[in-house]
């Protein structure tokens, strides 16, 4: 019996068209291509030499898209070991291990201070219905993870009341699609 596979694609840049295969599970929601296109248009595709943090990496789709579009470095944080192994295979296949680091841990309990690094762009696409959006913003502030004028992308469940999020970041873009809403904040 063949193993079921699912995939998502890198949609632009050096690795445009590359498939990222993964074993599907109900907690995994790779960011849709249309959503990625909107996000990177919001950023004006200006990722050249930027450092990125993909806090709930999953398949790594957002961080890989950033590398494909010129980001200098991406750190992926993912709690599921199987997804980390899958992401390692993708990095090797694309020969970009030197631009990426994978940390297999729960992003919410990780001590980000050991990275001694700030990021130009932080991707937040936490599991839905676990109340992780506010905690994620709190961690960004607590560990001072964002450079001045950096960006935070948040993808969340459609019914999350974004007005209740406490953050010093300014919401500059918003859209929605399917079961998700997504936002771009500026630091």
Describe the predicted segments one by one.
Residues 1-187:
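Class I S-adenosyl-L-methionine-dependent methyltransferase catalytic core
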């Amino acid at each position: 019996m063949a193993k079921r596979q699912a995939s998502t694609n890198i949609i632009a840049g050096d690795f445009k068209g590359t498939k990222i295969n993964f074993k599907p599970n109900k907690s995994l929601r790779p960011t849709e291509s249309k959503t990625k296109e909107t996000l990177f248009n919001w950023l004006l595709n200006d990722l050249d030499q930027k450092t990125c943090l993909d806090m709930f990496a999953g398949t790594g789709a957002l961080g890989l898209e950033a590398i494909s579009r010129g980001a200098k470095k991406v750190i992926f944080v993912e709690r599921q070991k199987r997804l980390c192994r899958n992401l390692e295979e993708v990095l090797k296949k694309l020969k970009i291990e030197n631009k990426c680091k994978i940390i297999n841990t729960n992003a919410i309990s990780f001590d980000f201070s050991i990275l001694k690094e700030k990021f130009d762009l932080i991707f937040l696409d936490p599991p839905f219905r676990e109340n992780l959006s506010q905690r994620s913003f709190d961690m960004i502030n607590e560990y001072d993870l964002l450079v001045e004028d950096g960006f935070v992308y948040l993808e969340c469940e459609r019914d999350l009341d974004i007005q209740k999020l406490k953050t010093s970041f300014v919401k500059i873009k918003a859209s929605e699609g399917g079961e998700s809403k997504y936002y771009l904040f500026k630091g």
